Every structure is written in C-alpha cells, then in structure tokens.
Amino acid sequence: MPPPIAPVSNIVLSVSSLNRQVRDCLESAFPLIWVGGEISNLTYAASGHVYFSLKDSSAQVRCVMWRSRAQLLGWRLENGQQIEARTLVSFYEPRGEFQLNVDAIRRAGQGDLFARF
C-alpha cells in the first residue's frame, strides 16, 4: 500500500484528482478477493448488468456484476441469498463511490455441502 499523502497547505487537489488517487490506492491495495454476505437491493438492469448490495450484520457495500460475467452465472440471484463473491475492489470516480466489481458468485456453503456427498 502506498504511503499516505502528507498534508501540504498550499496544494489543492481537484475532486477528479482526489478521486483518481483514492481509486489508485484502493485498487492497488486489494487483490482479487472473496467477500461473503447477503444480497439486498438487487436490480437486473436492462443493459444486462446486475447491481446489488452485499451486507452482513454491521455493514454493506455496493456491488456490480457486468453483463459479460452475469451471463455466465447459470442461476438467478435473489434478495436475501447468502453468497460468496469473487471481487475486485474499485472506486467509481465520477460519483466518488466505493464498490465491488463482481467477477464470480457462488452460493455460500456450497463447497461444504458438495464435499459431504
């Protein structure tokens, strides 16, 4: 992770520049990771992209699964499902929003269930 930028009183960043730096820091700090939680606020967009929040008992994060990845899923997501999502952490610069770009999804515990049989 890059060292934090030391505050300098005479430097003023534009919002775009700040958001770009935040994006670069976040995206370089986190590799492709699995994140588990419950689906909420699920939207299937006309474009084919899937938008939802992934939450646990004390936090939530916005997620997007692009059409090209969503087409490979093979089952329909629903609010309330417990899942594990393989994600890339990203920061959407135009709105200054942290989100997860979802690459793949599996039902939570699916691996354990199949291992028993």
What is each PLM-predicted segment?
Residues 1-117:
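Acidic, two-metal ion nucleic-acid-processing modules in DNA metabolism proteins
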